[in-house]
From Swiss-Prot:
Region (Disordered): 128-164
Record protein name field: UBA-like domain-containing protein 2
Organism of origin: Homo sapiens
Family: Belongs to the UBALD family.
Pfam families, alphabetized: UBA_8
Stored CDD domains: UBA_F100B_like
Residue ranges with Low complexity bias: 146-164
Keywords: Acetylation
Residues recorded as bearing N-acetylserine in the entry: S2
Entry keyword Acetylation: yes
């Protein structure tokens, strides 16, 4: 292959510049050449020139960039919009059924966690330490209900104790 690596790299940079800036390829090539193929410098130059109305007078005037993290575009407009925004405004000003439905549960709503626990279930008591957990003298729950505690469960408990 006789493709020059510099030409290939320059073509890739031009294509990336066109995608990033949205300009024509010939303008991207001119800006990159003027910036000695420094991508960020050329991109910065492109956006600074597009923000200045009379770019041939840009050496006489100092303009702050208008779209940086410190100064978003149309900053005064954004401040004005935020100043009009109130968190409680929507709830107080509108009494529509949709607002009421969004803020309160339906009339037939009965959350399971608000009801009292079933009487057959013993309250859970957290162990004071991991070593004293097996020393609590409470009957082990059986499954299925009514089944007798058999040797299989005792073997399982012994196997669990052996793993510790």
């Amino acid at each position: 292959m006789s493709v020059n690596m510099d030409e290939l790299r320059h073509q890739v940079m031009i294509n990336q510049f066109v995608l990033a800036a949205g300009c024509a390829a010939d303008q991207a090539k001119q800006l990159l050449q003027a910036a000695h193929w420094q991508f960020e410098t050329a991109l910065s130059t492109f956006f600074q020139e597009t923000n200045i109305p009379n770019s041939h007078h840009h050496h006489q005037m100092m303009c702050t960039p208008s779209n940086t993290p410190a100064t978003p575009p149309n900053f005064p407009d954004a401040l004005a919009m935020f100043s009009k925004l109130r968190a409680s405004e929507g709830l107080q000003s509108s009494n529509s059924p949709m607002t009421a439905a969004a803020c309160s549960p339906p009339a037939n709503f009965s959350p399971f966690w608000a009801s009292s626990p079933p009487s057959h279930q013993a309250p859970w008591i957290p162990p004071s330490s991991p070593t004293t957990f097996h020393h609590l003298h409470r009957p082990q729950p059986t499954w299925p209900p009514g089944a007798q505690q058999g040797g299989a469960q005792q073997k399982a408990m012994a196997a669990m104790d052996g793993q510790r």
